[in-house]
């Protein structure tokens, strides 16, 4: 169930401070964060945010279509390597 509109979007304060600091300085370096639960807000457009996926930080360039989504949606935590192949079928 989505978050109530009267509450507004959730964003961690430490991430919000980093975003505001980068916007006023015009800094284009990636902002490292572990906060996958934070929502993307219009202030983040044009920034690169490195979102942690459990092993490494995945760089995510924020565009206007991403507003309202969570940062964790753009940093997959699992790698899919495909199903096991049938060795008998390959020989034929």
Curated annotation (Swiss-Prot):
UniProt GO cellular component terms: cytoplasm; small ribosomal subunit
A Gene Ontology biological process term: ribosomal small subunit assembly
Keyword Ribosomal protein: yes
InterPro entries named in the record: Ribosomal_uS19, Ribosomal_uS19_bac-type, Ribosomal_uS19_CS, Ribosomal_uS19_SF
GO MF annotation list: rRNA binding; structural constituent of ribosome
Pfam families: Ribosomal_S19
Gene3D superfamilies according to UniProt: 30s Ribosomal Protein S19, Chain A (3.30.860.10)
Keywords assigned: Ribonucleoprotein, Ribosomal protein, RNA-binding, rRNA-binding
Tagged with keyword RNA-binding: yes
PANTHER family tied to this protein: RIBOSOMAL PROTEIN S19P FAMILY MEMBER (PTHR11880), SMALL RIBOSOMAL SUBUNIT PROTEIN US19M (PTHR11880:SF8)
Role, per record: Protein S19 forms a complex with S13 that binds strongly to the 16S ribosomal RNA.
Annotated NCBIfam families: rpsS_bact
Similarity field: Belongs to the universal ribosomal protein uS19 family.
Protein known as: Small ribosomal subunit protein uS19
Upper classification of the organism: Bacteria, Pseudomonadati, Pseudomonadota, Gammaproteobacteria, Alteromonadales
